[in-house]
Every structure is written in C-alpha cells, then in structure tokens.
Amino acid sequence: MSWSYLNDSFVKKEDVKISPFDRGFLFGDGVYELIPVYRGKLFLYDEHIARLVNSLESTKINPPKKWKEFRTVVEELIQKNGYENQAIYIQITRGMEEVRNHAPNHQTVPTLFINSTELTLDIENKKNAKQEFSVKVQEDMRWSRCDIKAITLLGNVMSLNDTRIDEVIYHKEGLVTEGAKSNIFCVLDGIITTPAISNDILGGITRQYFIDLFLKLN
C-alpha cells in the first residue's frame, strides 16, 4: 500500500482527489519541490525547503497551514511508504476557487499535495549504462522566471517530446542557460564552469552542493 498526503491527511494514493476547480489544474498556478531520500534520510532538506519558500514568496502563494510541522509530516510519509530510497514530490497550488478568474483571491486556502515514489539506485546497472547521450540545443523560448520552481512546465515538456533525445540544452542570446531537466556544468581548459544564477535558470540544490564541494577540493 502506498500513501500520499493531501492538505491535512495521509491518504492512500488511489484515494487522492483534487478538485478540477483548483487553480493548479486551471492555470498551472502552483510551485513544487522534489527532495531525494537516501537510506531513509532526507538529502539537503533545509536547502530544498528554502527554495520552496522562495517560490511561494515569489508567486505570493500562501504557505500551507501545517508549515511549522512540515518536516514531521514529510518524515512520517517516508516511514509509511517504507522505501529505503525515495523521491518526495511536494506541490503547493494557490488553491480552489469556484469562479475561474486570472486574478487570484489572496484569501484562497492553498492545496498541499505530497507524494512519495521509490527511487531506484542500481549502481551496477549504471556502470554498464550507455556513455553517450543524444542532446538537442535550442533557443530558450520559455518564460523569464525559470528561477521559480513552477508546476507550469509545458515548455520543458514540448522540448522533450521526442523519443530520440535524452536532454535539451537551452541557450538565450548566445549563452547556455540550463537543461530542460538539469543544470549545466562544463569543463573548459581544465576549469569547471556553470552558468551564473539568474532568472533564466533554476538554482539547483545539487548544483550548489557540487560547487561547494569543488571549492573545498580547490
């Protein structure tokens, strides 16, 4: 049996129900975060939550009611599902409004949805995995607030709607920005480089983790 969390309750996955009048469904009006769990431990939880808070503040979406107990809820969900390695998906939309209107009601109660799926870390298979990847390079024609981890990912979906490619690398004004589902690192003349943080890229948590690691190793 697999469990999710919706608003104030743990719910069996097959029983999760969200209104079609939710602004996340109608407008893609929401933000999300994905936190990996390795051997039962949350990876860089505080950093992920800080980015989630930034997304909420940038979009002026109200935080969920149980914000102070949020980590407790997440850890209980991890225990209930029992996978050693998991991917915790957190989505917060602006909430449900009966009248469809582009302009939001700032008193609307947000919808909180948390889901857990098993994360497969098959090291032996990865050692034998393909070493070459098919990548497409294209101009970034998505919106200009990629620093917000928004659920509106249609641009990314359209870019990746091709079974022949593994990833898309975006560029804007001649400069590489990010991948459709990744941050970019490159070794140039023996120096590791990555695009600087701006509104054109999402500040990856793992990206920053490796930057800090590289600086320590010098």
Annotate each language-model stretch with its function.
Residues 79-92, 99:
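Ordered, amphipathic secondary-structure segments that act as subunit-interaction surfaces
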